[in-house]
Amino acid sequence: MEQGEASPPVPAEHEAKCDTSNNEEEGELFDFDSGDEVPEADRQVPSADDRTRGAEAGGADENTCPAGNGTGAEPAPEAEPAKLVVPTKVNPYSVIDITPLQEDQPSSPDANTEEEGVGLRVPSGYSVPVPCGYAVPSNLPLLLPAYSSPVIIRAESVEEEEAAETVGDGQCNSLSSEDLPHSSEQGSQEGSALARWAADPANTAWMENPEEAIYDDVPRENSDSEPDEMIYDDVENGEEGGNSSPEYGWSSSEFESYEEPSDSEGKNGIPRSFLRSSHKKQLSHDLTRFKAHCEEKMRGLVASTVGAMEIQQAKQRQERKMQKLMKAAKEGTKDGLEKTKAAVKRGGSFIRTRSLVSQDHRCYFEEEQNLFIDVDCKHPEAVLTPMPEGLSQQQVVRRYILGSIVESEKNYVDALRRILEQYEKPLSEMEPRLLSDRKLRMVFYRVKEILQCHSMFQIALASRVSEWDVVETIGDVFVASFSKSMVLDAYSEYVNNFSTAVAVLKKTCATKPAFLEFLKLSQDSSPDRVTLHSLMMRPIQRFPQFILLLQDMLKNTAKGHPDRLPLQMALTELETLAEKLNERKRDADQRCEIKQIAKAINERYLNKLLSSGNRYLVRSDDVIETVYNDRGEIVKTKQRRIFMLNDVLMCATASSRNSHESHAVMSQRYLLKWSVPLGHVDVIQYNGGSGAGEHCRHHAAHSPESLAVVANAKPHKVYMGPGQLYQDLQNLLHDLNVVGQISQLIGNLRGSYQNLNQSVAHDWTSGLQRLILRKEDAIRAADRCRIQLQLPGKQDKSGRPTFFTAVFNTLTPAIKESWVSSLQMAKLALEEENHMGWFCVDDDGNLAKKETHPLLVGHMPVMVAKQPEFKIECAAYNPEPYLSNESQPASPSTARGFLWIGSCSNQMGQVAIVSFQGSNPKVIECFNVESRILCMVYIPAEESKPQETTETKDPEATASRAPHVPTICLGTEEGSISIYKSSQGCKKVRLQHFYAPDKSTVMSLACSPQGLYAGLVNGSVASYTKAPDGSWNSEPQQVIKLGVLPVRSLLLVEGALWAASGGQVFMASVETHTIENQLEAHQDEGMVISHMAVAGVGIWIAFTSGSTLRLFHTETLKHLQDVNIDAPVHSMLPGHQRLSVTSLLVCHGLLMVGTSLGVVVALPVPRLQGIPKVTGRGMVSYHAHNGPVKFIVSATAFQNKDRARDSPRSGSELQDEDPKDLLCSEEGPSCPGQPDTYTSVWLGDSLGLPTQKNDLSSSSGSLNLSHGSSSLEHRSVDSSLCDLLRDPSASPRSRPQGSRRARASSALVVCGGQGHRRVHRKARQPSQEDLVSSVMVWQIPLLGM
């Protein structure tokens, strides 16, 4: 025999590829590895026992199996002696152990019966293994077979599936059931030949000395032969297995000896028909055919097998996974147990030998369908009864909303049925097949399961609708139907698969015109002509629709209605479900997008770079790149696409190409221009530092060098773009200063001249001021969409780093704001302090890395002089108003206010003011107070009426009145209440100072538009009102006596004052000052309430001792949830120290808890107006204070209501305003209604004008415009330039009313305590600096908002 004949035949192409269209389980449900797609090189061919299972019924093993049992139901014999049990039914996907039998194994009665029925008796010393069919000496050392390795099922890509279908869709397997009769007849003949040969004593004489004879195809366990090379391909490692070694499979030593004669073998009488040698003997015709059949089967087996160790490892992984699942089921709920059982069922199909028998797939489909309840039975539809008479208006509205819910659900279920009946069913039945079974499952994945979930919901809905006039509740039906884990599983798998399904449909439409025609016919035949894509979008849109409907229902449900709490719970469940779906979809999309980008980019090294590690796509944007020459002129513009990854920024040119000539299917390809590490990317902003935005104002002049657009441009060149606009503004400011000096000199003239007088000089000044306003508008318009990046370049010849500048323009100002914010967040996440910022474990106890955890911006001391005797006690945040327009995000993404921090020593207090106006927070003022500060609260400015604004002439008088400026109220230990003015640029100004009744210590403060409330140490609450002049009355209007214990916490909840005294919470009316209700927060004696935080319709309560938080419903006062933070904290911190809650905050989907150990715990909660229950595991910060966390506050900007509905006005509109309307108080932009977006930017030094302020006031407040001036020589030039560069959204006539605002991508949270430390770092003795009062600033990503 030739050497090439020893190699097993490569499986037929149609056999290998036909499996891709079989109905097998995708590898997404129960993945034991990373979950990513298996590389092409690692794909495994079908295992041999499955490929030959159909032939075993007619082969040599037919003699050991009953007739007709061709599905492999015979139990696999084990290596260890054990009693063989023949099961009635075997899962065709389970792993079958095909270890050869031992002679000393006790044979089961069933096996004997089978042998007798067949009539073949195997001689002593032999056993016939089920899968192989050739005899093995029973006393040879056992080897685990290498052809029963498990196959990890994975989802093939669309390209692989397309390649498989080019061979032919729907080809039958070569080992189908149609070949069984012929195989059975042939096997019977070969079996009789084996029996006749084995009965001859001459043929078995060699067994007397078995140690000298081994088969070449059954290697000895103690063989010391060293195979030199492998002549078989590494079937496990695919094409990459070219350099195979014996550890991967069968070596050449096991087959090369077949060519050579062996004297010892001949002497001992081993039948050469089993040795595969070239020696020819007189063999019977039957035995020759049997030998050839065994050789062919053996080659097929060996070619499709992998190492025996793989199956053992897979079994161990399965056992570990099962142990974890059962542990989770025992610790979870009944629903979790059912989910575990379903997962175990699914998991059994993932570690199995791949089967090509169609019956196996039918069994699998039956198994998968059994995971969901079939509710296709007839049930009555949900139909509202006729509306009875005498209903209130609210009841009528609720009935209409219920009708909308019923009609919406009916249409949704009909859409799901149309997908299955009009598309999936015809495609699965038509011949020839347009979509393979595998593609059908990819396209319509989990649609049936979603339909079953909603069919059950429809049954419950119909039952409730039928009794609506009696019950009038619907929220509990939603809670019961959509709080099940099966709903989350079905929807998440559908949503994650949606993009893949759409890709399959698009590609099939392009490659198969018949499929496109089928979709068109199906659409035309439908009454509403809805496309398949629109129908498939319905599940993605369903939960937002539910949330909107329930919100409408809740708005029309009065307090005290029995359906109100169930509706709020339903909203919470739906929002939590939607949030989890979004999170899973986001994770799946990030992995998918990075693979698509890696495939579409032409750089090979970058392709490998993108495919490695935990890299994911943050965002991609289409922008216009502008290129300038040395003179600052625009050379060209080019459309680019910027890919922002979590650690890389890439710029590429997008190009489309036709993938098929006959159909216009465009596939994106990218030509990479540059890629740089994200940490080296800097945004150049002319009008402020990073994050300052357009609200930052500068006194210092910008040099021409800093305004250049090109990095290496020369200072004396003239530049276009924002740099040139800033230079023009500088020139105008210079000229205005000169004209001011000329005006003063003209006043010294003693003569009278026609064209040289004060009137002319005033006209010059007014004209320059108008030009300055126009120039500022042009700068703002140019900067709104412009992103200028400084990027690292190649090193120069001397090895020094170089930089280059890229200028991009986004499509809208909102995109620019969002892009810059995303860049800031991504760079922040790369900093060393955030690499391990939070400790979080999953359900299995493993560390889980979350991308939405708060990021540490920084930590800083808050004392001007480091004084460790002052310890932080409380804080209050004073937000600055911002203008809400389309050019800026109506969001708290960038705080622009001031944080007042109160610290205490033994006898006195100190206030530090931290400003968030710039890119980095900094302490701008610090002063002492007479007594220890225990609490403080921010009091917003009272909105002034329009007539009061026009009548006010004196800006100083306006600023001094308390109602029109924001203030901070301090409560001290000595019982005094101090009111301080708080606004931009102001110094310490105390407006009022008075004492509480009996000079009782002020423990807590709260304010409302009606009054100021102080919780006292004697168990009373003092209520203060405002005097006619806007100041607070020093005597309380009412003192509410609650008890004898201190009032530690005050909250205003829906017009009622909640006061915590001891372990009780009292609800008092802010109008009548009477106690309306009270709540017993804890039944244990000695539990004292320390903190309260309200969100939605729930209130979280913490206690001075213990680590448990309690959630109560604010309307019914029902106890809803308990959360103990002890477990997550002590999972991270060593030892077991006493833990208590020292601060509390609910914001942006997180319940943030400050602890006595200095760490912060963040628990996820919903964001809507539902119940803020904790929906997941908590995170514990690795950044901590050296003492208790004294406060946690949210640094959130608020909208300027006076100008929120107005649009930005241009300079031409401002010049027509009355001068008195442009006057501003000394507070500048912080004045209520002052649009700081429209004001000019003073970039030069003080101009010496009488109206110029020395603080941060805007230039529009210092302008006294003159009417009637017509001497503006440069007006036409500057006007045209301004019109070209002004943002179209600045005009109210050109802006659409429905234009979208930018969304916030992050929010700031500040916590304070003593010093800063990093948990789990080497412990050291804290120094004096470590005990200084400090704050930590966190930035919270808002990905889900």
Swiss-Prot record:
It comes from the Eukaryota. The modification N5-methylglutamine is found at Q1314. It holds the Pfam family WD40_2. Ubiquitously expressed. The modification Phosphoserine is found at S157, S355, S1262. GO terms for cellular component: centrosome. PANTHER family: RHO GUANINE NUCLEOTIDE EXCHANGE FACTOR, RHO GUANINE NUCLEOTIDE EXCHANGE FACTOR 10. This is Rho guanine nucleotide exchange factor 10. The gene is Arhgef10.
